[in-house]
Amino acid sequence: MMFSRFFKAVPARAPAFSSPLPVYQARTMATVRNQRPVERATFTIRDGPIFHGKSFGARTTISGEAVFTTSLVGYPESLTDPSYRGQILVFTQPLIGNYGVPSTERDRHGLLKYFESPNLQAAGVVVADVAEQYSHWTAVQSLGEWCAREGVPAISGVDTRAIVTYLREQGSSLARITVGEEYDADQDEAFTDPEQIHLVRQVSTKAPFHVSAADPQCHVAVLDCGVKENILRSLVSRGASITVFPFDYPIHKVAHHFDGVFISNGPGDPTHCQDTTYHLRRLMETSQVPIFGICLGHQLLALAAGARTVKLKYGNRAHNIPALDLTTGRCHITSQNHGYAVDASTLPSDWKPYFVNLNDSSNEGMIHKSRPIFSTQFHPEAKGGPLDSSYLFDIYIDSVKKYKNSQLAFHPSRETIPSPLLVDLLPKERVDVAPTIGMQNVAAAAAAAAAATA
């Protein structure tokens, strides 16, 4: 009887928010800070609750869209994923940072082994508890040291269960991390909305670069909307040398030099990339080249085909989301990170849904009925996450090789293998991609860029 009364007294979920601006005090942290002085920090959701905690990152104030991930591991990969540009990432896993942050070591292809881009991409980090004492053979620094070095504020000691409950019920919201200051309700102008910023322009390479395969068997053009390193690795490791272009490059004008076209993941609203969708539409009208898109690339391909996209209430960000392959009836556990989705009901008649999300029934992929063109909303390259759907890269590369052989049958002199001159002249990594230095600075940079092109 005593135990039954006890369990009845414990709520099964975070409490509802009865007032518009409740204040939640920081809880006692489980990790030891070795008596280091800790500075106060505040996480404020616009028109929502305020959470007081402790700063463990850069001493700066930022704002952006607050989103959450339920991934248990893979925080170095998540935080360097360009798709998180402009977002304050809330981790539901209670303890973050216990295996530290790895080095910037590169593999034999010149790609980063442990990160998905050279810089920390999230605008801010929110955790319940941060581990300052880390242990892993690849670790070279703590999560706090990394955030401070990258200029990204981070807050710990807050009730992430309450934060996630609010975001699930109210939807992804604008929020702010303030370090060493009290919340001022009159400072709503400080909330920067990343949806109003062309974030893809911030993360895309500014000039083409090339990555060679050890044994090149085909040549793929990649549109960089914020491409992850493991996507490039997934292509190169399968024998595809790749040339990576800026997101708005007129790919339809050079597609005849390539055996396939790939459209990468990236941040923000897909409707901002109107030049990209136009170029993809022209590509599908003028070429039979195989095309594969992932995440934002899936959405851009859908827009180019004539479909529409919608913004989800709070998005899907996790490493364990089930997606059903509608062609085989098999379920795959997938890694996802997106706030928009394709409206499958708007797909043209020559397209059909490929995958569907078994949690919320949202579209997870589409495939052309007669051509080698398909795309997925989830990330088959994982990193982090399961590799259930990595076979999709094999399907794509097989179609690329088949296309190459068919073209050689009609045009024996056709050559798509990159020349040594091209390989020597082009850079081997992203060109002029600025790091995240706080969303207010990103917004200022975007405004300056818009003024310069006006």
Curated annotation (Swiss-Prot):
Q: Name one GO cellular component term.
A: carbamoyl-phosphate synthase complex
> Could you name the active-site residues?
C295, H379, E381
Presence of the UniProt keyword Nucleotide-binding in the record: yes
Where found in the cell? Mitochondrion matrix
The Swiss-Prot or TrEMBL record annotates one GO molecular function as:
glutaminase activity
Task: Tell me which Pfam families the record gives.
Answer: CPSase_sm_chain, GATase
* Entries under SMART domains matching the protein: CPSase_sm_chain
All copies of domain Glutamine amidotransferase type-1, residue ranges: 219-406
Where is the major localization of this protein? Answer: mitochondrion
UniProt entry keywords in alphabetical sequence: Amino-acid biosynthesis, Arginine biosynthesis, ATP-binding, Glutamine amidotransferase, Ligase, Mitochondrion, Nucleotide-binding, Transit peptide
The transit peptide spans 1-29
Its EC number is: 6.3.5.5
Q: Is ATP-binding one of the keywords UniProt gives this record?
A: yes
Q: Its pathway?
A: Amino-acid biosynthesis; L-arginine biosynthesis; carbamoyl phosphate from bicarbonate: step 1/1
Family under the similarity heading? Belongs to the CarA family.
- What is said about its interaction partners and assembly? Heterodimer composed of 2 chains; the small (or glutamine) chain promotes the hydrolysis of glutamine to ammonia, which is used by the large (or ammonia) chain to synthesize carbamoyl phosphate.
Q: Which PANTHER family match?
A: CARBAMOYL-PHOSPHATE SYNTHASE ARGININE-SPECIFIC SMALL CHAIN, CARBAMOYLTRANSFERASE FAMILY MEMBER
Q: What is the protein's given name?
A: Carbamoyl phosphate synthase arginine-specific small chain
Q: Which organism is it from?
A: Emericella nidulans (strain FGSC A4 / ATCC 38163 / CBS 112.46 / NRRL 194 / M139)
Its gene name is cpa-1
